[in-house]
Design a protein with these regions (language model features):
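A helix-centric hydrophobic-segment signal that preferentially recognizes long
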Residues: 2-177
């Protein structure tokens, strides 16, 4: 009787360990997939910014410092891998892009340019997509981190060296209209 109870207890613990491990792996993959979605949108944004800079440069040659700042921030954003540090760069880049768009008020020919208006619409759409992807990613990070930090899953997480994921904190500057 005691041996059967012991075998049953071991089987239950083993089953729980397997289920817990599989849930942790699932959550880790969700975080990776969600980050991939964020990365796709950031790359789309990074591809649009040089086009916007070039359109503004053609119409507003005297705004060189704004153009250089946006270009520098875009290059830093492309190179950064850490979600927390990338969030800081992307927030600054968003402010720079908003300054570029605000230049249209001072240059009527730029404001009327079809390519500028198209780029502005694409950037607005991309900013919205980044926010959707960021929310999903941060939700996936929250699920994984909660599972890693709560008992009894933390036992399996520590045993298999699961690590918490970083949140992606990025708040774009609201467009001034």
């Amino acid at each position: 009787m005691f041996e059967a109870s012991l075998v049953l207890l071991v089987l239950v613990l083993l089953g729980w360990g397997i289920v817990s491990y599989n849930l942790l792996v699932r959550d880790r993959h969700r975080v990776a997939q969600a980050w991939s979605d964020v990365d796709v949108q950031l790359k789309r944004r990074h591809d649009l910014i040089p086009q916007l800079v070039e359109v503004v440069r053609r119409h507003a040659a005297f705004e060189q410092s704004v153009l250089e700042n946006v270009t520098t921030l875009r290059n830093r954003g492309v190179a950064e891998a850490s979600p927390s540090k990338l969030g800081e760069v992307e927030t600054a880049l968003s402010a720079g892009v908003q300054r570029l768009i605000a230049l249209a008020e001072a240059y009527p020919d730029l404001k009327a340019s079809r390519s500028f208006l198209d780029l502005q619409a694409n950037l607005t759409d991309t900013e919205n997509q980044i926010q959707y992807a960021r929310r999903y990613y941060n939700g996936a990070v929250n699920n994984l981190n909660t599972r890693i930090e709560t008992f009894p899953d933390l036992v399996v997480a520590r045993l298999f060296a699961f690590r918490p994921a970083e949140y992606f904190e990025f708040e774009p500057v609201a467009a001034e209209r």
